[in-house]
Amino acid sequence: MKRLLYIIIGVTLLLTSCDKEDSTNGHLDGFWQMSSSPGITWAFQGHILELRDVKKVHQDIVMSFTREGDKLKLSDPYRVDRDSDDVALKDADMLIPYGISNTSTEFRISELTSSRMVLDNNTTHLEFRKF
């Protein structure tokens, strides 16, 4: 009887300790390669966007994002510094290589599939492939 009680408690703990992270981002989550500049990648997870230059020409950036329907809002960019604290960006100079012209900006999601994403705003047209 005591053994059965331990088994029930153990199974209960296992089932309650496992939690799956749910994301409402759909196809947006994952790694995207910019078509016009193959060394530039955008990576979406949760509410964080990581901008990375795989060729290491430009500084890596992290930003917050929200998605509301076909709108993608980007804000709060930080320059990634692995050796000390990340640094908040005051201007958009470091964002320009990633196709972003302001520290807070909004794109319209023109197309989003499991393999392709197209973003537009008044000044920029960005195309990505998922990998």
State where each predicted segment sits.
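Sec-dependent signal peptide recognition
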Residues: 2-8
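C-terminal motif of bacterial Sec signal peptides marking the signal peptidase cleavage site
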Residues: 14-17
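Short, conserved catalytic or interaction motifs in soluble domains
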Residues: 20
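Tryptophan-anchored aromatic micro-motifs
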Residues: 26-41
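A short glycine-rich beta-turn/N-cap micro-motif
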Residues: 30, 48-49, 69
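Contiguous, well-ordered beta-strand patches that form the walls/edges
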Residues: 38-41, 52-114
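Edge beta-strand at a domain terminus
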Residues: 116-131
